[in-house]
Amino acid sequence: MADLYEWGGRNADGVWEFDKKRPDWDLPIHQLMAKYGVSIFFQGHDHIFVRQEKDGVVYQETPNPANPFYGETTDRFRSAYKSGDYRPPSGHLRVTVGPSITKVDYIRSWMPKDETPEHQQGEVAFSYTVKPGK
C-alpha cells in the first residue's frame, strides 16, 4: 500500500527508483503526506469501500452508489487490497468535518427491489473517525 512509484518510490520488484524516475521531486507523495500531517486521503478509481492506514495517513477508496453488484464475490478489485477495512460495493460516503474530529460513514445503496429488512437504502454499514493531522 502506497509503496510503489511516485507514491512510495519503489518499483514493482521493491527496488528504490524514486530518484531516477522523479528526479525533481523531493519526496514520494506518501512521505509528503505523512511529513505534513495529512490525516486522510480520498481516492475514487476502483469504486469500492476500502479503508487502509499507513504511517498515520488514512487511505479511503470511495465506493460507487450505482454499483448493482452488492456482494463481495462480484468485486473484481478485492484482491488488490491486502489489508484494511473492506465492505461490499454500492454506496457513498458521508464525511462530517469538525474542528477536532472528522467522521466518515459508509452509506449503502440498494435498489428498491433488492431491499430486505436487513438491507435498507441509506443504512450506515461502517463508520470511523479521524483526528486532524499535525
What is the role of each PLM region?
Residues 1-114:
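Long, structured stretches of catalytic cores involved in phosphate-ester chemistry, encompassing
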